[in-house]
Amino acid sequence: QPSHADLLDHLKLVHQNNTGFTEKIANNCKDKFGKNSYDILLEVLDKKKHLNVLDIACGSGFMLDLCNKRFEGKLNLTGIDISLAELELARKKLNNTEIKLYQSQAQKLEFLMDKSFEAILCHWALPLMDPIEPVFTTIKRILKNRGIFAAIIDGDINTAPEYLNIHNIIYKYVQQEYPSYGSIELGDLRARNSIDLYQLALKSFSDAKVSIINHLLYFSENPKALAREVAGFFYASFVLSVKGHKAMLLDLENYFLSRIE
């Protein structure tokens, strides 16, 4: 049975070998108005109120770059991530900016001063953090009074039936090779469902307004390309052997073909 350290190493290895994969996927998933999850998250920012912004788990710096361009370099931006490989890509991307980048876990941000950010953002990484309470404690410490913390997280697995079907196809192949995979998931399971996350946030931010908003995103492609891209949503798919990965992609492709009306 994998330990917490094993899971963290798995997470780091996936990002080391697949730098920049998160934005490649997320950038193509859009709502009915054509907005992706980065657009939706950045909508919470107000340049008159949010001068100092922290991106937790900034990865390759995609959202920092987007934010810097959208606000014409007028915000003081900082990013932290556990992956040195992702941060190396971020430094190249943000080379000609004043954006600060640090390698650290979200639970260990002692180098950031109390009440130093008006806004803290986290894109698609909160459910991977464990333990999560210290993350919220840290956010509360470094967030200014009347500041805002906003995150994009995975939706409840049962919100969209198609998502659950895809999950089951991928895990079928993963558990054939690693029977115990999934017995312990990456991160804190409470951050993967809205009810538990809401209660946890209320406990951590007792003096703040807490809201969770469901938002459905879509990704359209031909079945073969869709199978390849959708598999990248799941960290589990990265542990498969070449043979297993190929079989999984074919199964996903056939599933999508069967859904074409």
Describe each PLM feature range.
Residues 1-48, 62-66, 70, 86-89, ...:
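Conserved class I S-adenosyl-L-methionine
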Residues 2-29, 209-261:
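C-terminal helical/coil "lid" or tail adjacent to the Rossmann-like core of SAM-dependent
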Residues 54-56, 60-109:
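Class I SAM-dependent methyltransferase SAM/SAH-binding core
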Residues 111-120:
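A short acidic, Gly/Pro-enriched loop at the edge of an enzyme's catalytic core
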Residues 119-132:
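A short SAM/SAH-binding and catalytic strip from SAM-dependent methyltransferases
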Residues 133-148:
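A short glycine-rich, Lys/Arg-flanked "PGG" loop and its adjoining helix->strand segment in the class I
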Residues 148-219:
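Conserved catalytic/acceptor-binding region of the Class I
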